[in-house]
């Protein structure tokens, strides 16, 4: 130990001495970033239009879990049934598969010659990425444009090496990034991509999150941690109930959400349609407990406050919040307290719309943040705040006009905040606003 102290006290000796230090690096202006393309695969359907329509129509993507859903190919039937019987949670939010409209085509994305070895969560990412790129009308072929296009797509549980499949679809030499921050992965991926554009690393970024963790091992692990809903195994569609007094855990889900982010002038010059502007990105850490947030929501408060400060907007200018609320007893209450702390009188005025869309989609883990960011962008575009399903008996933390939406609400939404808070205390808030004029 004493030897280590002696080493650390030694002065740094440089081989080459300079009489003059370098000038500071050039100060690059922070560029504005907008959303120009959207793509989704969710338990509500495949595609942005189908998912959004079912969400605002108050439909639910949760269903009963079956032994076949455990994906235990190669095991005998007795082992599969024994495993299924041991699970305390028997509901899940599963992507609908098939050939029809709004269905995920497994033959195209998992069984075709090009995708036969593709992991399911990567197939979801590729499907939503293709939709987002076509929506943005950004399919570059020139080397210069491809070099200025990057990818930032993360997964919560899947193999991160497979993210390269999405990168190869999009770019040759642009930034290539994959965040892995539990349930905040999708939000961090979008926020990090925004900063890459702001600092000039790219002009276009394809960003989001993806997840496919409905399998025996993942579900068993969450069951052991007592994180999943177990009271409503016989009533799957009411099992995910954010902010409700009778909530008892989250419903595991799967899917992907991807958006195309673009530097504002770049988007304008090519005549791209602009959904919204990314105004703020706030991050924080709880450092409190591996699965439990601080009851006062200190980490959430910091993330939301930092997003607001970066945006230049006043809390009263935010019209909608898509809450992280997963339907867990502690997490939902902590976030509700945090929102009330940050938005104060605005939260109790009735002017601030608040909902958790996980009542409809379940918890998509690594994809939750990106899917809910897209919901926030669509809320701005369509002037509709989506509902919180199964909110029959609101938690006592809500009072004095402070109450989540239980039905869809048509309203002007100038700015929307999307929260994502992951296990381990990793938090992210994204703030979107109406497109610049």
Regions found by a protein language model. Give the residues of each.
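ACP-dependent fatty acid/polyketide chain-elongation machinery
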Residues: 2-114, 265-277, 374-389, 428-437
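Flexible, low-complexity linker/loop segments at domain and module junctions
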Residues: 7, 12-35, 141-146, 311-317, ...
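Condensing-enzyme catalytic core mediating Claisen C-C bond formation in acyl metabolism
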Residues: 32-36, 63, 233-311, 320, ...
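Conserved beta-ketoacyl condensing-enzyme motif
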Residues: 35, 56-180, 196, 210-221, ...
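Active-site nucleophile and cofactor-binding loops and adjacent substrate-binding regions
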Residues: 55, 117-122, 144-146, 177-185, ...
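Glycine-/small-residue-rich "gating" segment that lines the acyl/pantetheine channel
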Residues: 64, 173-177, 191, 195, ...
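Active-site-proximal alpha-helical scaffold in enzymes
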Residues: 125-138, 179-211, 251-272, 364-385, ...
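Acyl-CoA/ACP chain-elongation machinery
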Residues: 201-248, 282-295, 325-333, 349-401
